[in-house]
């Protein structure tokens, strides 16, 4: 039972490695070594964002779990909405910070004289769009873990970290070019957000009909 419930957390951590592997493969094909160097900056930045969202999700989990077990659906709903609002505020803040301070962020990792610097400065704002949707996804995964829907949380994590990531990295570059590579991860996050909202609204509709 514990393995089943916690497998989504394991996959969520592993999905960062999957993102790095796929990203390196696609970036080196399209932009060479400079592209990989630019993408590595996003890979350094991404785990920081992950830890913030994970902290919010883990803070909400015991409250949601306790009230779910106590038969208090209204408190579960309020806690979920509070967690989503908090994560969204952080996500929007991270996105704005990425856009406004892009050059300063990149300069922390690489000198301005390298070609990778310009690639990263041009690409990070695209990549930063995903921070907003990533916030919702982490809360959604944590929510389904808390209400003993481990299988659902695992499916969401697999879609986000593998399936949608593959679609983004291999479908967008031929259509959008270089921006499409940077938008692959945001697309995966966006599709995951749509999926989470879809199943959440479906669950509420079924409950209302009962």
PLM-predicted stretches and their roles:
Residues 5, 20, 24, 51-54, ...:
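Structural signal for membrane-spanning alpha-helices in multi-pass inner-membrane proteins
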Residues 34-35, 150-152, 177-178:
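Membrane-helix interface segments
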Residues 1-6, 64-130, 171-210:
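Short alpha-helical transmembrane segments in multi-pass integral membrane proteins
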Residues 1-22, 27, 48-52, 124, ...:
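Hydrophobic faces of transmembrane alpha-helices in multi-pass small-molecule transporters and flippases
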Residues 38-96, 100-102, 134-156:
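Small-residue-rich hydrophobic transmembrane alpha-helices
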């Amino acid at each position: 039972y514990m393995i089943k419930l916690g497998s989504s957390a394991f996959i969520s951590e592993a999905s960062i490695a999957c993102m790095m592997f796929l990203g390196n493969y696609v970036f080196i094909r399209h932009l060479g070594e400079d592209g990989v160097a630019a993408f590595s900056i996003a890979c350094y930045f991404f785990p920081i964002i992950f830890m913030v969202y994970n902290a919010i999700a883990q803070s909400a989990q015991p409250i949601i779990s306790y009230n779910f077990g106590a038969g208090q659906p209204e408190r579960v709903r309020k806690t979920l909405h509070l967690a989503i609002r908090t994560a969204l505020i952080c996500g929007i803040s991270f996105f704005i910070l990425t856009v406004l301070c892009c050059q300063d962020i990149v300069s922390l990792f690489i000198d301005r004289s390298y070609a990778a610097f310009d690639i990263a400065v041009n690409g990070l704002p695209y990549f930063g769009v995903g921070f907003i949707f990533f916030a919702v996804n982490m809360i959604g995964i944590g929510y389904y873990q808390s209400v003993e829907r481990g299988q659902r949380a695992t499916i969401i994590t697999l879609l986000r970290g593998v399936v949608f990531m593959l679609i983004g990295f291999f479908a967008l570059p031929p259509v959008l070019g270089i921006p499409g590579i940077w938008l692959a991860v945001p697309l995966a996050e966006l599709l995951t957000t749509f999926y989470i909202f879809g199943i959440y609204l479906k669950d509420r509709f079924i409950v209302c009909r009962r």
